[in-house]
């Protein structure tokens, strides 16, 4: 397969494709649909790797077909694999590169023609399709590309502390909340233990007398346990 600039044997002027002194006659016999994607080529002048597009050509038939890529402006493009063969029921990728991305070529439409013919030296043309090509100007001027954005970005509100200071302010609060939770939990466990201990005059208890609590102590433990329950429910 040959690489290089696309040929201009079919499309050589600004007129409609297929007309003119060098226009090709329409295909005779069965016509094969030319399936290509994308249907139009849009090049961007600000592409980092250079303005290029990938054109995929499909062969829906059961036989191999020969293809050619023609163009109205061959000096502006380089087509890799400008002609070759497509296997049956398969596809091939054609890389097209715009080699003249200058301002005078912005928004100028060119035309490519994909021509399919039967396999062989003098195979008849069985299908052709024309697609348009256009070069778009950069989104930003070239002299501004690669420079930092001059527009200032909004900063945090005046009363908002820096992230580092905020981190150091929130960290002690988290430690305080953790220690308070542990204190409340320990107090609740002690209160429940007081409620489970027997009274001094309770008979049948196997615990020593020192672990017997009075009724007043149980009332205080029940009151503290109620307060802790309210605190946990509110949080």
Curated annotation (Swiss-Prot):
Cellular-component GO terms for this entry: cytoplasm; membrane
Compartments where found: Membrane
Keyword terms, alphabetized: Membrane, Transmembrane, Transmembrane helix
Keyword Electron transport carried by entry: no
Record-linked Pfam families: Motile_Sperm
Sequence segments annotated as region (Disordered): 1-25, 143-171
Gene expressing this chain: MOSPD3
Membrane topology: Multi-pass membrane protein
Domain MSP: 33-145
Membrane-crossing segments per the record: 180-200, 213-233
Compositional bias segments (type: Pro residues): 149-164
GO terms (BP aspect): heart development
This protein's name: Motile sperm domain-containing protein 3
């Amino acid at each position: 397969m040959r690489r290089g600039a696309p040929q201009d044997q079919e499309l050589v002027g600004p007129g409609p494709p297929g007309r003119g002194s060098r226009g090709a006659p329409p295909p005779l016999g069965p016509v094969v649909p030319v399936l290509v994607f994308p249907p139009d080529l849009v090049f961007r002048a600000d592409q980092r790797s250079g303005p290029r597009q990938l054109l995929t050509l499909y062969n829906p038939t059961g036989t191999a077909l020969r293809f050619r890529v023609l163009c109205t402006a061959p000096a502006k493009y380089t087509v890799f694999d400008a002609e070759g063969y497509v296997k049956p029921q398969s596809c091939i990728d054609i890389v097209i590169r715009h080699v003249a991305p200058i301002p005078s070529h912005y928004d100028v439409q060119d035309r490519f023609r994909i021509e399919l013919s039967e396999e062989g030296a003098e195979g008849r043309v069985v299908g052709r399709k024309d697609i348009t090509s256009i070069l778009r100007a950069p989104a930003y001027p070239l002299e501004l590309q690669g420079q930092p954005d001059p527009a200032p970005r909004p900063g945090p509100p005046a009363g908002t502390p820096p992230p580092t200071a905020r981190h150091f302010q929130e960290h002690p609060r988290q430690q305080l909340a953790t220690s308070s939770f542990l204190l409340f939990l320990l107090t609740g466990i002690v209160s429940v233990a007081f409620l489970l201990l027997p009274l001094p005059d309770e008979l049948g208890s196997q615990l020593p007398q020192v672990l017997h609590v009075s009724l007043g102590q149980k009332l205080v433990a029940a009151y503290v346990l109620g307060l802790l329950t309210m605190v946990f429910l509110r949080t």
